[in-house]
């Protein structure tokens, strides 16, 4: 999917870029049976307090229900009926129509087009877009939408342009190199989808103006040094100051280089190599 630029008729258009959406199917509304209403929480938790700052507003969205597991359709071929936009995630989504008449959305892999036939299951061919257990995928292949627990559905590598690589297979576990650089052992019966996630140009888009961030539900980010001392550890001072200490969060946690992962976490034994920092 290409990048669209604009003539600078206004200052806000000078650096703004958007995706061209050439790959999307024309005239396709989302399938009503696979969508549901989505209430914006504006960063509030169940008690009404702000738990995630700088969230709120934005365009109303309907949630598209994505089949991350594809386990109950083993051995049933499906035709790609449409490639659609999803406002809730960075990649596009593909509408699959199975031979038994059922319809499902999946994350659209790079290179999958309308009319392609996809399949899931241990006997599915090695083809981009097919979902297989990790033990059935050859070493060196790129995968995405990887399960961590059998039957829970894909949890890893679901963002636009992302992919992991099968590094080795030994016993009950397959070693996978994740986009972060981490090498992790995953149980061989877990499912993964072959290929890369599509819409790889998403990372090259320039928002260009503050208003578009508001359309996306992102509110302004105020610097700590611009606040009062009661609001932030960097606040206060006469005139413009640098904060006077190493960068920290509003609650005093160091912002740079501070390790937040729990010591002796249960999943440490599955990590062969830590991620690239």
From Swiss-Prot:
GO BP of this protein: cytoplasmic translation
Highest taxon in the source lineage: Bacteria
A GO term for molecular function: structural constituent of ribosome
An annotated GO cellular component: large ribosomal subunit
InterPro entries the UniProt entry points to: NA-bd_OB-fold, Rib_uL2_dom2, Ribosomal_uL2, Ribosomal_uL2_bac/org-type, Ribosomal_uL2_C, Ribosomal_uL2_CS, Ribosomal_uL2_dom3, Ribosomal_uL2_RNA-bd_dom
Residue ranges, annotated region (Disordered): 32-58, 225-277
UniProt keyword Repressor, yes or no: no
UniProt keyword list: Ribonucleoprotein, Ribosomal protein, RNA-binding, rRNA-binding
Gene3D superfamilies the UniProt entry points to: 2.30.30.30, Nucleic acid-binding proteins, Ribosomal protein L2, domain 3
Key word Acetylation present: no
Reported function: One of the primary rRNA binding proteins. Required for association of the 30S and 50S subunits to form the 70S ribosome, for tRNA binding and peptide bond formation. It has been suggested to have peptidyltransferase activity; this is somewhat controversial. Makes several contacts with the 16S rRNA in the 70S ribosome.
Family as reported in the entry's similarity comment: Belongs to the universal ribosomal protein uL2 family.
Subunit field text: Part of the 50S ribosomal subunit. Forms a bridge to the 30S subunit in the 70S ribosome.
PANTHER family: LARGE RIBOSOMAL SUBUNIT PROTEIN UL2M (PTHR13691:SF5), RIBOSOMAL PROTEIN L2 (PTHR13691)
NCBIfam families attached to this UniProt entry: rplB_bact (TIGR01171)
UniProt xrefs under HAMAP family: Ribosomal_uL2_B
Name of the molecule in the record: Large ribosomal subunit protein uL2
Organism lineage: Bacteria, Pseudomonadati, Spirochaetota, Spirochaetia, Spirochaetales
